[in-house]
C-alpha cells in the first residue's frame, strides 16, 4: 500500500489537542492544590468565619477572688448586676419609638440617643447600660414583655463590692467598669484575683437573628483566687478611728498617715491614709473640703481639679509619698553611731545657743540651750545640736552606709503598688558638712512613711530589717490555702546589743522626754517624736507632726507610726498631737491581743519639753 502522508492541518489539530490537554491538567492540578489548601491548611480560618456567622457568643463574667482580713472579715466580694444590650435588627420597627421612650425613662437615658440607636437597622448589638441593679433589670424585662418588644438582651454580670465601705480603702484599691484592678491590692494582684470568664454560644441566622429552634452551649466561669491579709480588722478600726478624730480635731490640711506593724515579722497589721474614700464610689470626692473646692470651679479648671482630687484620694500616702521625717530620724542616727562605735551610751555632748557648721548656724527648737547631755538625754530632749555632733563623729561615709543598710535608699518591697523607686537623699560624694549636719537630725532627706516604720522596726527588734507585707495567704475559690507567705528578713543592720541599748533610750524618751504623751498605764512604751519642716512647701510654717511608738518596749511586738501633715492646731509638735494617737491605738491593740499589763507605768503627762515646742520644730538657720 502506498504510504499515507499526514497533512499539515491534521498535525496542527493534534498539537492544539495536546496543548488543551496540558492546560486542562494544569487547571485540575491547580484546583486540587487550592482545594487542599482550603480544606487542610486553612480549614480552621474558614471554620472560625462560619462559626462567627452562625453563632453569637455571650461572655459570662467571672467573679474576682475575695479578700479577707487576718481575722476573717470579708473586705472585697462580688455582687450580681445586669448589663443591658440591644439588637435593633430584632426589634419590631413599629415598637422603636415606644422602646426608646420607655427604656429612657427606666434607665435615666437620653430618649433621642436611644431612638437613634434603635433606628439603625444594620446594628446587631449596642450597649444600653452597664451593670444595673436587679430592680432596673426587672423593670426593663417587665416593660419589654408587656409591650411585646424583642431585641433587648439582659445579661447577668458581676461587679466588685466592698462591704465595709471606706474601711482600708487605700490598701484595697478598687476596680474599673471592666472589673480590672486600678489601685491598691486590686491592682497589685490583678492577675491572681481575675477569674476565667465563661461563655454562652447561641445559634443565629444569616441576618443575626436568634433562631427559635436554636441551641446553646455553655462554658462556666471560674472565680479568681483570693487573698487573706495580715491586716487585723480590729486594729485597723482602732487606727482609723483615732486618726479620723485627730484629723478633725487638729484641722490637718494634707491628710494623715498611720501604720501599725509587727516589729518582728514586718507584717502590716493596720495602715490608713485619712481622709479616705469609698471604693464602691471611687470617683466621688469624700473629703468635704476638697469637694467644696472642686464644686466652686467651672469648666476646664473644675475638670482638672476633680482629676487631681481623685488622684489624691486614691493615693496611698503611707506607701507612695516621701516626707522629711524630722526628729524621728534621730533614732537611726543614734543607732548607727552606737553600732559603728562612733559613740557609746556614756558619750556626752554640749548644747549652747547654736552650733556652726561650715559657716551655717544651727540651733535647737525654740532656741533652747540644753547644756551638757548624755546620749540618752540628747534623745529625750530631741537636741539638734547634739545630733549634729553625733553625725559628725559618725562621718558621712558611715552615715550613708547605714542609711542604705536601713533600706532608706530603695523600695521596701511591700506587696502594694506605686512605691517610689528611690527616696531623696545625699550620697557620700555629694554630702558636705552642712548636709551631713541637717540629715543627722532628720531634715534634707525625704523617705517614705513605710520606710521610716520598717527602719524603726529594725532598731528595736534585734537589728533585723524585715520586708513589710500585707498578704499572708493566697486562697483558692473554696477558701482553702494555696500558698502561705512567710516573713522575709532582708539583712541584719545592727548588732543585738545596739538594739537593746536603743530600746532603753526610747523608753527613757517616753518616761522623761518629749514622748510623755505616749505613756500607757501598765505597759512600757518606747518612742520618739518629730516635728519636721516641709522644706519644699511655699508655706514656711508648714510642719509634719509625727510620732513613732513601740510596745511593749521591753519585749517589742507592735510599732505605731502616726504622721499629721500640716496640722492647724494650738501646736504642731508631734509629741503633743501624734503621740496620744499612738498611745490610744497601741493600748487598744495590746489589750485586744491579750498582752498583760505587767508594770505600773506612770500616768500620761501633758507636759511638753522645750525641744518639741512648736515655735521652730526642727528648723535651723542658714539653710
Report residues per predicted region.
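Beta-lactam-recognizing serine transpeptidase/beta-lactamase-like catalytic domain environment
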Residues: 76, 205-216, 263-328, 332-564, ...
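Periplasmic/cell-envelope proteins involved in peptidoglycan metabolism and beta-lactam response
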Residues: 1-297, 313, 322, 397-407, ...
Amino acid at each position: 500500500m502506498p504510504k499515507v502522508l499526514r497533512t499539515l492541518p491534521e498535525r496542527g489539530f493534534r498539537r492544539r489537542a495536546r496543548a488543551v490537554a496540558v492546560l486542562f491538567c494544569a487547571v485540575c492540578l491547580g484546583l486540587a492544590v487550592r482545594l487542599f489548601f482550603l480544606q487542610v491548611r486553612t480549614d480552621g480560618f474558614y471554620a472560625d468565619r462560619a462559626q462567627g456567622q452562625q453563632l453569637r457568643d455571650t461572655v459570662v463574667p467571672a467573679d474576682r477572688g475575695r479578700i479577707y482580713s487576718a481575722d476573717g472579715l470579708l473586705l472585697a466580694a462580688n455582687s450580681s448586676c445586669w448589663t443591658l444590650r440591644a439588637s435593633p435588627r430584632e426589634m419590631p420597627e413599629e415598637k422603636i419609638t415606644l422602646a426608646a421612650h420607655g427604656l429612657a425613662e427606666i434607665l435615666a437615658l437620653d430618649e433621642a440617643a436611644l431612638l437613634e440607636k434603635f433606628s439603625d437597622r444594620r446594628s446587631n448589638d449596642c450597649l444600653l447600660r452597664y451593670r444595673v441593679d436587679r430592680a432596673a433589670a426587672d423593670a426593663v424585662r417587665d416593660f419589654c414583655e408587656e409591650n411585646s418588644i424583642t431585641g433587648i438582651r439582659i445579661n447577668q454580670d458581676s461587679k466588685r463590692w466592698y462591704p465595709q465601705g471606706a474601711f482600708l480603702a487605700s490598701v484595697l484599691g478598687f476596680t474599673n467598669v471592666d472589673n480590672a484592678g486600678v489601685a491598691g491590692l486590686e491592682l497589685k494582684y490583678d492577675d491572681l484575683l481575675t477569674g476565667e470568664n465563661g461563655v454562652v454560644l447561641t445559634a443565629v441566622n444569616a441576618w443575626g437573628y436568634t433562631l427559635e429552634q436554636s441551641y446553646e452551649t455553655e462554658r462556666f466561669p471560674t472565680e479568681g483566687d483570693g487573698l487573706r491579709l495580715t491586716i487585723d480588722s480590729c486594729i485597723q478600726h482602732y487606727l482609723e478611728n483615732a486618726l479620723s478624730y485627730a484629723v478633725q480635731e487638729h484641722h490637718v490640711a494634707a491628710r494623715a498617715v498611720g501604720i501599725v506593724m509587727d516589729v518582728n515579722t514586718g507584717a502590716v497589721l493596720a495602715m490608713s491614709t485619712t481622709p479616705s474614700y469609698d471604693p464602691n464610689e471611687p470617683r466621688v470626692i469624700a473629703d468635704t473640703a476638697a469637694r467644696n473646692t472642686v464644686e466652686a470651679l467651672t469648666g476646664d479648671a473644675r475638670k482638672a481639679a476633680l482629676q487631681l482630687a481623685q488622684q489624691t484620694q486614691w493615693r496611698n500616702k503611707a506607701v507612695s509619698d516621701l516626707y522629711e521625717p524630722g526628729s524621728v530620724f534621730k533614732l537611726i542616727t543614734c543607732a548607727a553611731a552606737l553600732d559603728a562605735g562612733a559613740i557609746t551610751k556614756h558619750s556626752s555632748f554640749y548644747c549652747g545657743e547654736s552650733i556652726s557648721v561650715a559657716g551655717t548656724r544651727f540651733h535647737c527648737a525654740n532656741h533652747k540651750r540644753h547644756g551638757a547631755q548624755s546620749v540618752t538625754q540628747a534623745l529625750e530632749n530631741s537636741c539638734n545640736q547634739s545630733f549634729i555632733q553625733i553625725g559628725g563623729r559618725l562621718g558621712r561615709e558611715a552615715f550613708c552606709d547605714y542609711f542604705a543598710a536601713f533600706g532608706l535608699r530603695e523600695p521596701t518591697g511591700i506587696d502594694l503598688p506605686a512605691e517610689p523607686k528611690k527616696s531623696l537623699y545625699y550620697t557620700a560624694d555629694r554630702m558636705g558638712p552642712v548636709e551631713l549636719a541637717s540629715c543627722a537630725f532628720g531634715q534634707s532627706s525625704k523617705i517614705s512613711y513605710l520606710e521610716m516604720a520598717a527602719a524603726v522596726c529594725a532598731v528595736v527588734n534585734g537589728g533585723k530589717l524585715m520586708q513589710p507585707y500585707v498578704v499572708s495567704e493566697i486562697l483558692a475559690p473554696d477558701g482553702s490555702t494555696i500558698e502561705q507567705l512567710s516573713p522575709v528578713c532582708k539583712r541584719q543592720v545592727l548588732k543585738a546589743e545596739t538594739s537593746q541599748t536603743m530600746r532603753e533610750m526610747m523608753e527613757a524618751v517616753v518616761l522623761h522626754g518629749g514622748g510623755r504623751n505616749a505613756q500607757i498605764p501598765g505597759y512600757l512604751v518606747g518612742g520618739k517624736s518629730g516635728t519636721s519642716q516641709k522644706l519644699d512647701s511655699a508655706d514656711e510654717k508648714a510642719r509634719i507632726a509625727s510620732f513613732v511608738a513601740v510596745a511593749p518596749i521591753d519585749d517589742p511586738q507592735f510599732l505605731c507610726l502616726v504622721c499629721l501633715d500640716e496640722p492647724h492646731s494650738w501646736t504642731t509638735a508631734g509629741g503633743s498631737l501624734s503621740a496620744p494617737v499612738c498611745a490610744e491605738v497601741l493600748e487598744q491593740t495590746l489589750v485586744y491581743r491579750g498582752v498583760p499589763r505587767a508594770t505600773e507605768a506612770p500616768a500620761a503627762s501633758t507636759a511638753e519639753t522645750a525641744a518639741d515646742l512648736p515655735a521652730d520644730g526642727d528648723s535651723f538657720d542658714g539653710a
